[in-house]
């Protein structure tokens, strides 16, 4: 993996974790962003999360907040084109 992509993924992970925490949704309590993977063309960002409570509810809450999270990423991370966010449970992460 190129340094640039790894660095960008780290920035996106950090920014997303902070923005998710700022949502103050009770379904997102004790939710951790474990990893992010940017697709080769940069159009999709797979976000792997672990919820210590109701995981399905947390994934639904994140999907509903996708537009708000992308807008927040636009303010924090400089990218030519922002990716679509795809929220997945941590156990489904690629090896």
UniProtKB/Swiss-Prot annotation:
Keywords tagged on the record: Cytoplasm, Ribosome biogenesis, RNA-binding, rRNA-binding
InterPro entries on file: KH_dom-like_a/b, RbfA, RbfA_dom_sf
The keyword rRNA-binding belongs to this UniProt entry's keyword annotation: yes
Pfam families cross-referenced by the UniProt entry: RBFA
One of the GO biological process terms: maturation of SSU-rRNA
A GO cellular-component term linked to this record: cytosol
Molecular function, one GO term: ribosomal small subunit binding
Subcellular localization: Cytoplasm
Predominant location: cytoplasm
Family the entry assigns: Belongs to the RbfA family.
Known function: One of several proteins that assist in the late maturation steps of the functional core of the 30S ribosomal subunit. Associates with free 30S ribosomal subunits (but not with 30S subunits that are part of 70S ribosomes or polysomes). Required for efficient processing of 16S rRNA. Probably interacts with the 5'-terminal helix region of 16S rRNA, bringing together different domains of the 30S ribosomal subunit which aids assembly.
Known partners and oligomeric status: Interacts with the 30S ribosomal subunit as a monomer, binding in a position overlapping the sites of the A and P site tRNAs, and displacing segments of the 16S rRNA. Probably contacts 16S rRNA and ribosomal protein S9 and S13.
HAMAP family hit by this protein: RbfA
Name this polypeptide is given: Ribosome-binding factor A
Organism phylogeny: Bacteria, Thermotogati, Deinococcota, Deinococci, Thermales
């Amino acid at each position: 993996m190129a340094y640039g992509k790894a660095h960008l993924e780290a920035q996106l992970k950090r920014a997303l974790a902070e923005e998710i925490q700022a949502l103050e949704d009770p379904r997102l309590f004790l939710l951790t962003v474990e990893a992010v993977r940017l697709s080769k063309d940069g159009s999709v960002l797979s976000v792997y999360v672990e919820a210590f409570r109701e995981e399905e509810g947390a994934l639904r809450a994140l999907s509903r907040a996708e537009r708000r999270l992308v807008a927040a990423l636009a303010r924090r991370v400089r990218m030519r084109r922002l990716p679509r966010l795809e929220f997945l449970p941590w156990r489904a992460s690629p090896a």
